[in-house]
Every structure is written in structure tokens, then in C-alpha cells.
Regions:
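Positively charged, proline/Ser/Thr-rich regional signature most characteristic
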Residues: 32-107, 116, 187-252, 256
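Short active-site oxyanion
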Residues: 46-50, 139-140, 259-260, 284
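Thiolate-centered catalytic microenvironments shared by cysteine-dependent enzyme domains
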Residues: 90-185, 189, 209, 269-286, ...
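Classical Sec-dependent N-terminal signal peptides that target proteins to the secretory pathway
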Residues: 3-31
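C-terminal soluble interaction/assembly domains
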Residues: 247, 257-309
């Protein structure tokens, strides 16, 4: 009798464990694109979960980081490069595979991207890395709401110091080219249907100010201005609630029924716009014009409008701005 009872208990515990693993993996697969620090607490230092921390410097990471996280820098590690004078373009697929593999990440891992959490540029960099993973066909990926700042400010959360070089893995991608738009796609939207989303500030959209690598002031005809700061709460890395984001796009006249293309000066800020529409609001046909105005504005055959007629776009030149341009935003 005791033997029978023992066998039954063994079978029960075995299947209970299988059910637990099933629902644990289900939770990972269907996790939201934005997760909070409480969700992350129970996920740190797990074999199939990789926390990728984006920092301004290795020194910042060494001072304090989430346990078992992996350090990266958006600029120095090579997440983007310049091609034909167009900055902030994704490198070749093979180079991206090598880069991600060097972090010890495989295509089956769940990746949580953690930015410093200090403002919209942090959010844009994190969203650009997220977009890169999605472009490579990665399935399981999220951003940490509030970034590392929100994690560190919770005294119940542990942090580590120092740096450990991750063990390299082979990363294999399944590229999804449908996420990228080119200038021909943009022209089709101008002349037919769909929406162009200008993610820059209203001053740049209207042509009051402009910044290299955009070579002309103003915006693309028929573009709708939805600045990045609208996506975030008070210049932090905390996203607005979904219902409020829906109101923003509804107010701006953007519908899910037709496709959308996001752009900015060089594809960085618009990565955040893409993330909100594609991942949070689940717009089914949203693309990123990665080359953005860096490509568009230098081709004088392509139209731009100066909404308040602040300048003559056909003659205006960037002058000194070109010399002072840096891929890294000012701190």
C-alpha cells in the first residue's frame, strides 16, 4: 500500500512539475513587450533569460547593474553604422549575428532590454535594439519599463558590481524584411494611402529648427507629427498607459486600418514610434524608414514642406551643424 501510494505521489509530482514548466514557458512566450521591475524580479539569473543592459559607459555598468545582466553600448558595440553618409543604419545580418552571439544570446533566449532610464534618447536606443532583434526574427523580447533607474530606486532589488565577459554563442536569425520601409514606400504613402509619422519635436516638424543629418528643414508631405515625448511619462523611460497611447494616435487621426511608416532624422527616434505602434498598440502594418530624413532630405528631387515657411528648403544648408554632428546625443 505504501509503495503504491509512493508511486502515485511520484507520478503526481512529476506531472505537476511538467505543468509548472509549461505555464512558466507560456508566460515567457506571451509576455508583454513592456515588462515592469516586479515581473523581472523572478526572472533574473535564469538560463534561458538574458538581461541586456544598455549603458553610456562600461564604467557605469561596473558600478551597478542588475544581477547576471549583460553590458552593451549602443554606439561603441556596433548596433548601428554609417553607410553612404547615412548614419545609424543596421549593419549586415552576419555582423549583427556575431554581435548578439558575443553577448551569449541565442535565438531561443528571452531577452529583456534595460536602458538607463534617463530620457527619450535612452528609450529610443532601447527601442532600436528591440527593433533589431525583431528584424532578425527574434520571438521573445521585452523592454523594462522605467529602465535601470526604476530598478535601482527600489531598495528591495539587488544590484551587482564588476564585469564578467559572457560566453559566446552562435546566433541564427530569420530576417523579417517587411519591417523596413524605403523611400519608394514613403512615396507610395504620399501619393496613395497610409500614414507617415514624424517622431521628431514639433519645432523640427514645422521647420523652425533642424539638425544634421537632415539637410533641409521641414518634413515629408502628409506626415503627421507625434513627438517621442508623447510616448513617455515626464521625460522618463516609463511608457504611457496603453489607453492613453490609443487616445494620442486617435487624436492625431491615425488608424490601424492602413499602414504606417515612422521616420525622424536618422531612424533612432522613430524606432520608439515604431515600437509603440507595432508592439504596444499592435498596429498590423507598421514599418520603420530607417534611413529617414538623412537620406530623404539630400535627394532634392524628393519633396519636403516647410509648414510655416520659415526657410527656403531648396537653398538652406546645414553649415556648421554638419561638423558638430555626433551619432551620440548630447548628455
Amino acid at each position: 500500500m505504501n509503495l503504491l501510494l509512493g508511486n502515485l505521489m511520484y507520478i503526481f509530482n512529476k506531472y505537476l512539475f511538467i505543468i509548472f514548466i509549461y505555464f512558466f514557458n507560456l508566460n515567457i512566450i506571451y509576455a508583454d513587450p513592456v515588462v515592469d521591475k516586479d515581473w523581472l524580479k523572478n526572472k533574473i539569473c535564469k538560463d534561458n533569460i538574458k538581461i541586456l543592459e544598455v549603458h553610456r559607459s562600461k564604467k557605469d555598468y561596473e558600478i551597478a547593474h542588475i544581477p547576471c545582466s549583460i553590458y552593451t553600448n549602443f554606439y561603441s558595440d556596433g548596433w548601428r553604422e554609417t553607410k553612404d553618409s547615412i548614419p545609424l543604419l543596421m549593419p549586415s545580418v552576419s555582423n549583427l549575428e556575431k554581435l548578439i552571439g558575443s553577448f551569449g544570446i541565442s535565438s531561443s533566449d528571452y531577452v529583456i532590454i534595460v536602458a538607463p532610464g534617463l530620457g527619450k534618447y535612452d528609450a529610443a536606443e532601447a527601442a532600436a535594439i528591440y527593433f533589431t532583434f525583431k528584424y532578425l526574427g527574434h520571438k521573445n523580447i521585452s523592454l523594462l519599463d522605467g529602465g535601470f533607474k526604476s530598478w535601482k530606486e527600489d531598495w528591495d532589488n539587488d544590484t551587482e558590481t564588476g564585469f564578467i565577459l559572457p560566453q559566446k554563442k552562435i546566433y541564427r536569425s530569420k530576417v523579417n524584411k517587411n519591417l523596413l520601409a524605403n523611400k519608394d514606400d514613403v512615396l507610395k504613402v504620399i501619393n496613395k494611402s497610409g500614414y507617415l509619422i514624424d517622431a521628431r519635436s514639433s519645432a523640427m516638424y514645422m521647420g523652425i529648427n533642424y539638425l544634421f543629418p537632415a539637410l533641409r528643414a521641414g518634413t515629408i508631405p502628409n506626415a503627421v507629427n507625434i513627438p517621442n515625448e508623447w510616448m513617455l511619462k515626464n521625460n522618463t523611460l516609463f511608457f504611457q498607459e496603453r489607453e492613453n497611447l490609443e487616445k494620442i494616435f486617435e487624436y492625431s487621426g491615425i488608424s490601424k486600418k492602413e499602414g504606417q511608416i515612422s521616420f525622424c532624422n536618422a531612424g533612432l527616434e522613430s524606432a520608439l514610434s515604431w515600437f509603440v505602434m507595432s508592439e504596444i498598440l499592435e498596429f498590423p502594418n507598421n514599418k520603420l524608414y530607417e534611413s529617414s530624413l538623412a537620406e530623404w532630405s539630400k535627394d532634392m528631387s524628393l519633396p519636403m514642406i516647410d509648414i510655416i515657411n520659415f526657410s527656403n528648403n531648396s537653398k538652406k544648408s546645414v553649415g556648421k551643424d554638419k561638423e558638430s554632428f555626433s551619432m551620440k546625443p548630447e548628455e
